[in-house]
């Protein structure tokens, strides 16, 4: 065992003495040692329950003959930091979490690793770290929140964001906004639609890095405790067979994950995160793969933010296994791909499959809700390296209008709340990319305000930042290259005509190349937002969105 370097032999007596102090007994030195990265925090609901869930996980690992050691990693709440300078920390935390997992795995020479995650960046962060650690491992998702309820309708956090715009437009009262705020989040768990956390949790099951069916179990559902304990047996098998993530993560595995995202109208953040995970696994994956898979994969799940149902209701209907079953029946998944259990994806789906009688959440492919998947990649003179649109959140496939140009989200939000954005406008928020912000913050506050004011179908938004999984409407993000490095979005001026052609996959400013060249000659780079510390290092090393906003390797 790898951990024998820590715990066996004459010279390791001091190490054993220290391990005895934390509860390792004589018989335990013969067990595989496992690191459990727990992203618990009592600062937000998504990860609030992970302290308790970790106890069930560790109990299951011990029952399976392993010895677990728990450690922490940071967790940033997108919902709390949204629309503030704190949002810069969100995507940065993905890299810090991955580094933390790698650091602990290497520092303690553990034989296996488990990532216990919940909020948006903790899922890809722990997954990147588990893959990078080079030992058998898996990622477990803490589960979705239960929906809130007000006046007979189910609520998620997105309804609160949109209520801000409704209040600004005078559509609801201050008292109604307060009631929505009070009732939307009834307890622990991640945001309750097919937003980023639930999208990535499903993607990890499709990849084979999480047990099929586990991640769909809601945070406070009684089944969660039993399934968490059972997961210990899976890791014990993987360690016994030296079955590591890089042994089963293939290009087809990643295409399966992309198809799952497309079929459920999932978050555009999945593009960034799956590109980053593919890099860790040494697998070729590009923006074009997302577009090609989405073209042939219909939307078959009626999930929020664009649809009707919450993630809790998806679990009741049959969960992720039901989605995968439908896609397998239509030949839209590679069922022969192996998973962390050593069995194929198709075998795992059959073991986990169930369907609630009369459910209306997941449809057969021949009765799909939309003929094409939810992700569209646009290119053109505004986005030479690509931009991403979630088509499942909008019915419009073309748009042309004048640019309303803002160099920060705050400036755009001010105009939206003052009612100064008009139907037909194209709101442009730039200098908020991976390097520019830095950290590529999400624009949910401003996009929700636009929708809340009733302008969703009539206003487009472009940004070199990104969007929450809760965003809906004609919102195009991940524009690459970003403004900070001199991408064409930096050259836009107020009133420039912008054309969006979804069918043709084009995003263009209607200016001659000569004019763009004149503006490019006048453009000057901006000073960095940070010159010292973590954010300065991140901005110096991060790559563009079309590469997953991963950090540069030195070689």
Swiss-Prot record:
Functions in the biosynthesis of branched-chain amino acids. Catalyzes the dehydration of (2R,3R)-2,3-dihydroxy-3-methylpentanoate (2,3-dihydroxy-3-methylvalerate) into 2-oxo-3-methylpentanoate (2-oxo-3-methylvalerate) and of (2R)-2,3-dihydroxy-3-methylbutanoate (2,3-dihydroxyisovalerate) into 2-oxo-3-methylbutanoate (2-oxoisovalerate), the penultimate precursor to L-isoleucine and L-valine, respectively. Its cofactor is [2Fe-2S] cluster; Mg(2+). PROSITE patterns: ILVD_EDD_1, ILVD_EDD_2. The modification N6-carboxylysine is found at residue 121. Homodimer. PANTHER family: DIHYDROXY-ACID DEHYDRATASE DAD, DIHYDROXY-ACID DEHYDRATASE, MITOCHONDRIAL. Keywords: 2Fe-2S, Amino-acid biosynthesis, Branched-chain amino acid biosynthesis, Iron, Iron-sulfur, Lyase, Magnesium, Metal-binding. GO terms for molecular function: 2 iron, 2 sulfur cluster binding; dihydroxy-acid dehydratase activity; magnesium ion binding. It catalyses: (2R)-2,3-dihydroxy-3-methylbutanoate = 3-methyl-2-oxobutanoate + H2O; (2R,3R)-2,3-dihydroxy-3-methylpentanoate = (S)-3-methyl-2-oxopentanoate + H2O. The active site is at 468 (proton acceptor). One of its GO terms (biological process) is L-valine biosynthetic process. Gene3D superfamilies: IlvD/EDD C-terminal domain-like. It is an enzyme of class 4 (lyase). Binds 1 [2Fe-2S] cluster per subunit. This cluster acts as a Lewis acid cofactor. InterPro entries: DHAD_IlvD/Edd (IPR050165), Dihydro-acid_dehy_C (IPR042096), DihydroxyA_deHydtase (IPR004404), DiOHA_6PGluconate_deHydtase_CS (IPR020558), ILV_EDD_C (IPR056740), ILV_EDD_N (IPR000581), IlvD/EDD_N (IPR037237). It comes from Thermus thermophilus (strain ATCC BAA-163 / DSM 7039 / HB27). Its EC number is 4.2.1.9. This is Dihydroxy-acid dehydratase. The gene is ilvD. Disulfide bonds: none annotated. Mg(2+) binds at residues 78, 120-121, 442. Pathway: Amino-acid biosynthesis; L-isoleucine biosynthesis; L-isoleucine from 2-oxobutanoate: step 3/4; Amino-acid biosynthesis; L-valine biosynthesis; L-valine from pyruvate: step 3/4. Pfam families: ILV_EDD_C, ILVD_EDD_N. Belongs to the IlvD/Edd family. [2Fe-2S] cluster binds at residues 46, 119, 191.
């Amino acid at each position: 065992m790898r951990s024998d370097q820590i715990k066996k032999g004459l010279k390791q007596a001091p190490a054993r003495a220290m391990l005895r102090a934390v509860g390792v007994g004589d018989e335990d030195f013969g067990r595989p040692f496992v690191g459990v990265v727990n992203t618990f925090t009592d600062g937000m609901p998504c990860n609030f329950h992970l302290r308790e869930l970790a106890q069930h996980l560790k109990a299951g690992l011990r029952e399976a003959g392993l010895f677990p050691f728990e450690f922490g990693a940071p967790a940033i709440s997108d919902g709390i930091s949204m629309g503030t300078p704190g949002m810069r920390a969100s995507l940065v935390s993905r890299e810090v979490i991955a580094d933390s997992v790698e650091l602990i795995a290497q520092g303690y020479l553990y034989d296996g690793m488990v990532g216990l995650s919940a909020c948006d960046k903790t899922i890809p962060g722990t997954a990147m770290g588990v893959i990078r650690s080079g030992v058998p491992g898996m990622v477990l998702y803490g589960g979705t929140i239960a929906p809130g309820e007000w006046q007979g309708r189910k609520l998620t956090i997105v309804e609160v964001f949109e209520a801000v715009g409704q209040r600004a437009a005078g559509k609801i009262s201050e008292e109604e906004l307060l009631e929505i705020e009070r009732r939307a989040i009834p307890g622990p768990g991640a945001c309750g639609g097919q937003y980023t956390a639930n999208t990535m949790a499903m993607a990890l099951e499709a990849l084979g890095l999480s047990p099929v069916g586990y991640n769909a179990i809601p945070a406070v559902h009684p089944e969660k405790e039993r399934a968490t304990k059972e997961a210990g047996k899976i890791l014990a098998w993987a360690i016994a067979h030296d079955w590591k993530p890089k042994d089963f993560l293939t290009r087809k595995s990643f295409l399966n994950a992309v198809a799952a995202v497309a079929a459920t109208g999932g978050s555009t953040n999945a593009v960034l995160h799956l590109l980053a995970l593919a890099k860790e696994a040494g697998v070729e994956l590009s923006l074009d793969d997302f577009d090609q898979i989405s073209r042939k994969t219909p939307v078959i799940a009626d999930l929020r933010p664009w649809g009707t149902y919450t993630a809790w209701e998806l679990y009741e209907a049959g969960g992720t296994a039901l989605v995968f079953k439908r896609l397998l029946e239509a030949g839209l998944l590679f069922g022969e791909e192996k998973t962390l259990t050593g069995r194929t994806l198709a075998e795992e789906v059959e073991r986990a499959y169930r369907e609630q009688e009369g459910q209306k959440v997941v449809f057969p492919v021949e009765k799909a809700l939309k003929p094409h998947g939810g992700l569209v990649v646009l290119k053109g003179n505004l986005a030479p390296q690509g931009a991403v649109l979630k088509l499942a959140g909008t019915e419009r496939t073309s748009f042309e209008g004048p640019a309303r140009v803002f160099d920060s989200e705050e400036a755009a939000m001010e105009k939206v709340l003052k009612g100064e954005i008009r139907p037909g406008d194209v709101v442009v928020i730039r200098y908020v990319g991976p390097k520019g912000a830095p950290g590529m913050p999400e624009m949910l506050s401003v996009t929700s305000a636009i929708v809340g004011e009733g302008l969703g179908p009539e206003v487009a938004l472009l940004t070199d930042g990104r969007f929450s999984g809760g965003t809906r409407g004609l919102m195009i993000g991940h524009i690459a290259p970003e403004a900070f490095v001199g991408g064409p979005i930096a050259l836009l001026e107020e009133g420039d005509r912008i054309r969006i052609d979804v069918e043709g996959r084009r995003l263009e400013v209607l200016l001659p190349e000569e004019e763009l060249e004149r503006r490019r000659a006048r453009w000057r780079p901006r000073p960095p937002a940070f010159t010292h510390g973590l954010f300065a290092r991140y901005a110096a090393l991060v790559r563009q969105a079309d590469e997953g906003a991963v950090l540069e390797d030195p070689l």
